[in-house]
């Protein structure tokens, strides 16, 4: 009987453990020490998403460069939508990345905005079907501060044909959000003044937030030096708005779709929340629809 209980317990643990976490071979957030020890590893792609000028001044040896702006597209009036699958296939294939590649995305952390642009690229690769995608904790700022090796050699990757296995379940559109108001946990990751409607960007038609949304600012995920807070701290912060019911569906949004991938990435990839989506149209799309409710 005791042995049976043990088997039942292990079975429950297995069922509770997200399948995509099993597929990972690298952690979702890697340290500078971890990455430094793997420079030259042919199984690892270092993707530098800074502007080409910054890349040319000095980058992690072996890193390839594709600016973060190449991974988000303007569609109509919306600023930051996921690329069309054919275009994304071309972008990923051009830098020699395959579905089996392990990729560490590296950017700057001079501003919080640069940090979440880096994470958006990581989420885009996950959407395309890669499993081993990570971001460098502290970005190039921490790398340089620690006097780790730099190179000015421009790396020219060998292109390959890429066909993604697209994870459409990672994104939600406006219609889905509307249909499920009151059933899903909406997480507004903007700073409090924008969430409350005290401030708004010019590209957002109406101030305020989607009714029922909780406020979880992107900046809360980071320390003052641009590194992530500890996993334990991030879990406490996430559960302050999601509660202990991690199995409920969670949708993150922001102003234009740039920063909402940050908490999506943290909750899904690091903390193991199984049902987290991004509404990339965000308040830019929602606020422009007069039939979509907004509250302050």
What label would you give each PLM region?
Residues 73-102, 218-250:
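Helix-loop module immediately N-terminal to the HCX5R catalytic loop
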Residues 10, 19-21, 257:
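Cleavable N-terminal signal peptides
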Residues 43-85:
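N-terminal, post-signal-peptide region of Sec/Tat-exported proteins
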Residues 82-176, 199, 208, 259-276, ...:
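Thiolate-centered catalytic microenvironments shared by cysteine-dependent enzyme domains
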Residues 1-8, 19:
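Bacterial N-terminal signal peptides that target proteins for export
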Residues 14-57, 140-206, 294:
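Flexible, polar/low-complexity N-terminal or interdomain linker segments that lie immediately upstream
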């Amino acid at each position: 009987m005791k042995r049976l209980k043990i088997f039942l317990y292990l079975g429950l643990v297995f069922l509770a453990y997200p399948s995509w976490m099993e597929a990972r071979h690298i952690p979702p957030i890697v340290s500078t020490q971890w990455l430094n020890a793997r420079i030259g590893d042919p199984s690892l792609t270092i993707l530098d998403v800074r502007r080409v000028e910054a890349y040319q001044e000095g980058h992690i040896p072996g890193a390839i460069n594709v600016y973060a702006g190449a991974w988000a597209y303007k569609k109509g009036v919306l600023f930051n939508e996921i690329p069309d699958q054919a275009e994304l296939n071309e972008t990923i294939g051009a830098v020699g990345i395959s579905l089996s590649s392990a990729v560490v995305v590296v950017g700057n952390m001079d501003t919080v905005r640069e940090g979440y642009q880096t994470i958006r690229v990581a989420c885009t690769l996950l959407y395309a079907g890669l499993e081993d995608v990570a971001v460098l904790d502290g970005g190039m700022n921490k790398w340089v501060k620690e006097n780790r090796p730099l190179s000015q050699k421009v790396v020219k990757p060998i292109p390959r044909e890429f066909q993604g296995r697209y994870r459409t379940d990672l994104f939600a559109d406006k219609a889905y959000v509307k249909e499920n108001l009151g059933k899903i946990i909406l997480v507004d990751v903007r700073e409090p003044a924008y969430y409350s409607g005290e401030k708004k960007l010019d590209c957002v038609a109406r101030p305020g937030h989607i009714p029922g949304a909780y406020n979880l600012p992107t900046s809360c995920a980071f320390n003052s030096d641009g590194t992530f807070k500890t996993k334990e701290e991030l879990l406490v912060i996430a559960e302050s708005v999601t509660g202990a019911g991690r199995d409920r569906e969670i949708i993150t949004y922001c102003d234009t779709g740039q920063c909402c991938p940050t908490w999506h990435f943290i909750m899904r990839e690091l903390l193991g929340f199984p049902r987290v989506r991004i509404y990339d149209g965000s308040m830019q799309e929602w606020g422009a629809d007069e039939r979509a409710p907004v509250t302050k």
